[in-house]
Design a protein with these regions (language model features):
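N-terminal subdomain of nucleotide-sugar transferases
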Residues: 1-66, 115-121
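Short, conserved loop/helix-junction motifs that constitute active-site signature segments
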Residues: 137
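Short His-centered aromatic/hydrophobic patch
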Residues: 126-130
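Short glycine-rich, flexible loops that bind phosphorylated cofactors or substrates
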Residues: 20, 132-133
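Catalytic nucleophile loop
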Residues: 29, 131-132
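Conserved protein kinase catalytic core
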Residues: 53, 133-134
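A conserved catalytic-core segment of Leloir-type glycosyltransferases
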Residues: 6-8, 46-114
Length: 137
């Protein structure tokens, strides 16, 4: 907080993938959210799996994806329920064809979530998602 405005911010930090030990994104989320919390702000992380490990006081909203990288073969991830949700089918088909759809599909799922929750936050601080769905917030 600064001298001009001593009101704490309500900050949302999206992260499509937040592995707590590798890759950097999950590690970044933990360190930055801890610092924001120490400054007196309210912080919530919305993440796909793998989920980050966060300090006490930082809320985690889990926004599941198909987590296709956890399968030896993406063909094994197929379930008929994929046909019900277009975003799930898109994620699966894109993965099968060598695409990296996680940022896009996370953004679309987050946009749906955000329609119900956007007024709870003052700031959205994105680290790496860069998804079109963020614009919809």
């Amino acid at each position: 907080m600064n001298k001009m405005n001593d009101k704490p911010l309500r900050i949302l930090m999206p992260s499509y993938r937040s592995h707590p030990f590798t890759g950097g994104q999950g590690i970044y989320m933990r360190l930055v959210t801890k610092a924001m919390l120490e400054l007196g702000h309210t912080v919530e992380v919305i993440s796909g799996q793998p989920y980050p490990i966060l300090d006490e006081g930082v809320k985690l909203t889990k926004l599941p994806s198909l987590d296709l990288y956890s399968y030896d073969s993406p063909l094994r991830a197929f379930k008929f329920k994929l046909l019900k949700e277009p975003i799930d089918l898109y994620e699966w088909l894109s993965h099968l064809s060598g695409g990296f759809s996680e940022p896009y599909t996370f953004g679309e799922r987050m946009a749906v979530w955000g329609r119900k929750n956007y007024n709870r936050f003052d700031v959205v601080h994105d680290n790496q998602t860069l998804a079109y769905g963020l614009i919809k917030l």
